[in-house]
Amino acid sequence: MSFEEEEKNKVTCTQDFLRQYFVSESVSIQFGLNNKTVKRINEDEFDKAINCIMAWTRYPEAVVKRTASTYLLSDSCKKSTTLSLPFVLDDALCIPKGVESNNNDTSLLYSDTLYGDDSLIRRNEQVRDELEEELSFTLLRSEINEIKPISSSSTPQILQSDYSAVMQETQASNGSIFQFSSP
């Protein structure tokens, strides 16, 4: 494979990844998020992210996935953010310090949390069908004041019954951190 073909293949793989990991607006409706809480990534932002990712990543596919997500997260969100993602939990180097250490203005939901353990291959067609016509991706942005626990205690809130994505508010020295985990 020539250098040009290899570069083209990397871009295609990264584009496929982004299409699959940034969920559609219909999913945000499932989670009861209104229009004010949905952050759209337009085509220009997408192209910028792709170019930047491909310029500074020469890593295996799994690492490219983490860097792609992390880049878009840090580049597109203007508010301070704390996060916990299934594919970066054990890789602190892939979480930008500005995102990792800031306070709790916003919590971001990712499709990896929503879809659970489904592989990219198994959900490829489903997500591609939803997003193929429109090169626009959704970050689900949940304002903390709109997220209420079931009770005044720290009882986890079940967001999706079929996967049982659990959101639990914990206190840290720099404020509340919303963590997403699979039961």
Curated annotation (Swiss-Prot):
It comes from the Eukaryota. Keywords: Activator, Meiosis, Transcription, Transcription regulation. GO terms for biological process: meiotic DNA double-strand break formation. Potential transcriptional regulator that is required to activate expression of a number of early meiotic genes including HOP1. This is Meiotic recombination protein REC104.
